[in-house]
Design a protein with these regions (language model features):
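Active-site-facing alpha/beta catalytic cores
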Residues: 2-242, 285, 293, 309-324
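Non-transmembrane, aqueous-exposed alpha-helical and coiled segments at domain scale
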Residues: 219, 228, 234-268, 272-313, ...
Length: 324
């Protein structure tokens, strides 16, 4: 609930600031498999298989936890289904009432530095008051008290994704029902690979992570494989270059996409290209680098950012002082 609450708060601020609709997609209810850069992990002189996500093994650094267990797939499925049911109930049952979301934001800025936050909330307050005066409110307009919320994750664990794929009896098309939107990771985007082949065959909107090693000609080939009909909205290209590499690599890819007349959505993932390892061994991202990549992306163009309502170590402002 808290995760959805924060996402609704953020989307309201973005909608008000940009005067544009915001599509709300959460990496939730299914992200239980993790790509790893190495097959093993070392700690205190001991080497064990890498943690591959709760779909496969456990995070605890002990030999028993790192043994793959197929029963985890059933638990992951049950967890995903429960989460999706809750999201559906919250998003359609009044939790997303525009007035309530606005009150959450007002509570957020109450004890904080005013400035730009208060300016945005004043703008939203004026808009809501104007609509109320015109007789438009959540009580008589369902769209103001409900929200369309979509789920997403990387289509990494192919046996699981395949088991969740169904045929639409009216069209004969295949849909991966594990999420609304699935993507192909930067490590699994080989044109002749199984992940590209799987995503090519489903009708879900799909994403493709684009990193520094992706050549322009490879991108064109992948676009033609994944979206042969050049359908608008089918393919999202998710850049993850790192703060210092965006302006070096992204313009070249954008230019070749424009030249070929390909219809894609550009998105930015400023998290995974800025990963560093702190002295404690935790992977984290300096917030300054995250913000820099977002700014550089917009300087050339939606963006994706990991967020949490909990205290986390995945992103810090001063990573050098990270000690927990």
């Amino acid at each position: 609930r808290d995760t959805l609450k924060v996402l609704l708060q953020m989307s309201l601020v973005l909608t008000a600031s940009a005067s544009m609709p915001v599509v709300k997609i959460g990496r939730i209810a299914g992200q239980f498999s993790k790509p790893r850069s190495a097959p093993t992990e070392k700690k205190d002189g001991k080497e064990l298989p890498s943690y591959l996500g709760d779909n496969i093994n456990g995070m605890e650094f002990v030999e028993k936890a790192r043994i793959p267990d197929a029963k985890r797939l059933f638990r992951a499925y049950s967890q995903s289904a429960s989460t999706l049911n809750l999201l559906r109930a919250f998003s359609q049952g009044g939790f997303a009432d525009l007035r309530q979301v606005h009150l959450w934001n007002l509570g957020f800025i109450k004890d904080r530095t005013k400035g730009k936050y208060k300016e945005i909330e004043d703008k939203i307050s004026d808009a809501l008051a104007f609509m109320e005066a015109c007789g438009i409110n959540p009580d008589n307009n369902r769209k103001l008290r409900t929200v369309n919320f979509y789920t997403s994750h990387e289509a990494l664990h192919l046996p699981f994704e395949e088991s969740m794929t169904r045929i639409d009896s009216t069209t004969g098309e295949y849909h991966d029902t594990s999420a609304h939107f699935v993507w192909i990771g930067d490590r699994t985007r080989q044109p002749d690979g199984a992940h590209v082949e799987f995503c090519r065959g489903i009708k879900n909107p799909i994403g493709l992570k684009c990193g520094p090693t992706l050549k322009p000609e490879e991108l064109i080939n992948l676009c033609n494989i994944l979206n042969p009909e050049n359908e608008a909205g089918r393919l999202t290209l998710i850049s993850r270059f790192g703060a210092d590499n965006v302006q070096k690599y992204l313009p070249k890819l954008m230019q070749v996409i424009k030249k070929e007349g390909l219809k894609v959505i550009w998105s930015c993932d400023p998290m995974h290209g800025n990963t560093i390892k702190a002295a404690t061994g935790f992977k984290t991202r300096p917030f300054e680098s995250v913000l820099k990549e977002v700014k550089n992306f917009f300087a050339d163009l939606c963006f994706c950012i990991l967020k949490s309502v909990q205290q986390i170590s995945a992103c810090v402002s001063q990573w050098q002082s990270h000690s927990h």
